Amino acid sequence: MAETSIEWTDATWNPVAGCTILTAGCTNCYAMRMAARLEAMGTEKYQGLTRKSGGRAKWTGKVKIDPKSLAIPERWSKPRRVFVNSMSDLFHVDVPADFIRQVWTVMAETPRHTYQILTKRPERMAEVLTRGDFPVLSNAWLGTSVEDSYVLGRLDELRKVPAAIRFVSLEPLIGSVAGADLTNIHWAIVGGESGPGARHMNPRWVNEIEMMCRRSGTAFFFKQWGGRNKKAAGRTLNGRTYDEMPAASI
């Protein structure tokens, strides 16, 4: 719903809010902190989505759809890359397929924008999008998050999804993913965790991914080293920045 400082996109759009902690990559999720802040400010959409645990905001597991937000992309006349649901997961089990279909309709009717949808639940993405009534949209990039080798199976699920562009976000990268199969994955984003309690990202893990991308023809985007002060840590790798974007496949 707003312009964003996220390096690989231009704006965020949140027709859904709230989520459930799923795997290790969720532990320090920035969206939990942001949702708690918005809840404290009295923003109705975020009421009841987080709770305090050990002094930190955690998801309650409650998910809210926001039909009013469906009109937002049409108001944007300037074409932009749009990160869909930076504050949730469109393919959370509690998001009705009918609502996902409404989101799809909005994307189809605003082809000037490029939509980037990221999920930790690619198995549901595949199940919903292969029902036969979700067209493959050339302006919809579909991706999954992979934080370590324990969840590499998400890439196999993503490959089942019919998509113009498939991508993987390896952020927060908290372990090696050496040996990952990037076949038919068009774009890889790599980033270290940032903020309180950020876990260290080993440079070797990043270089492994960059080499895998070269072998598979996958565009490589290095987002950040992360840490408590991500700006100070920067986003250069081996003396340069990597801002590659995928080429359209259909």
How should these model regions be labeled?
Residues 44, 50-55, 128, 132, ...:
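Short alpha-helical interface elements
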Residues 1-21, 38-42, 160-163, 174, ...:
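Auxiliary Fe-S-binding modules of radical SAM enzymes
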Residues 1-81, 89:
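N-terminal [4Fe-4S]-dependent radical SAM core
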Residues 35, 39, 53-54, 58, ...:
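Small/flexible residues
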Residues 39, 46-49, 104, 127, ...:
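Solvent-exposed, non-transmembrane amphipathic alpha-helical segments
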Residues 64-219:
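Conserved AdoMet/S-adenosylmethionine-binding subsite of the radical SAM
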Residues 25, 30, 43-46, 99-101, ...:
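General N-terminal targeting signals
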